[in-house]
């Protein structure tokens, strides 16, 4: 859960991309992760945080092997469930359920990704954010700027002395 959540928070990876992630997509020595493109998204090579590299190494070399041995599964996918199901959505449903225990307002993983991209737009330029988010079209990234503008308008209404 910690690794999956970290990939969503630090790299803005979508659920579908997490489900498709295979061992050869991890470049742990270089501290990078390769996200394969799809019909909707562009592929991209993203930097991992230092703690993510260690966590992923531990997961791939120890925990994942234990899960595969215990369940008798064979898979090239990075993430696999502990149960008999091969369905990745079960993993994500469990993650969202456990996150909701701490934050009741959380709707889904997309909500976290939206916050991540909105934050990236505050830090990076539009094109870099587009690349990092894997958006094929810049208009997809620009939609998050509108999201940010709406937040600013709400703040103005809330805190402006005349408003």
PLM ranges: what are they?
Residues 1-15:
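Basic, Lys/Arg- and aromatic-enriched nucleic-acid-binding interface segment
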Residues 8, 19, 130:
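The alpha-helix within a helix-turn-helix
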Residues 11, 15, 20-55:
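Conserved tyrosine-mediated DNA breakage-rejoining catalytic core shared by Y-recombinases
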Residues 26-28, 105-106, 125-144, 150:
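Short, polar N-cap/turn motifs at the start of nucleic acid-interacting alpha helices
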Residues 47-50, 131, 146-163:
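DNA/chromatin major-groove-contacting recognition/catalytic segments
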Residues 49-104:
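Active-site/catalytic core of tyrosine-dependent DNA strand-transfer enzymes
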Residues 93-131:
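Short, basic (Lys/Arg/His-rich) helix/loop patches that form interaction surfaces
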């Amino acid at each position: 859960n910690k690794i999956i959540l970290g990939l969503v928070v630090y790299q803005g990876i979508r659920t579908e991309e997490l489900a498709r992630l295979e061992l050869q997509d991890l470049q742990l020595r270089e501290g990078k992760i390769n996200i394969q493109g799809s019909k909707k998204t562009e592929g991209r090579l993203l930097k991992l945080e230092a703690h993510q590299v260690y966590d992923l190494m531990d997961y791939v070399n120890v925990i994942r092997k234990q899960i595969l041995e215990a369940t008798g599964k064979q898979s090239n996918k990075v993430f696999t469930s502990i149960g008999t199901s091969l369905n990745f959505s079960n993993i994500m449903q469990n993650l969202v359920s456990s996150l909701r225990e701490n934050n009741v307002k959380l709707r889904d993983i997309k909500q976290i990704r939206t916050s991540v991209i909105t934050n990236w737009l505050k830090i990076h330029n539009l094109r870099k954010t587009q690349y990092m988010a894997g958006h094929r079209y810049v208009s997809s990234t620009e939609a998050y700027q509108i999201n940010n503008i709406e937040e600013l308008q709400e703040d103005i209404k809330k805190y402006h002395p005349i408003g």
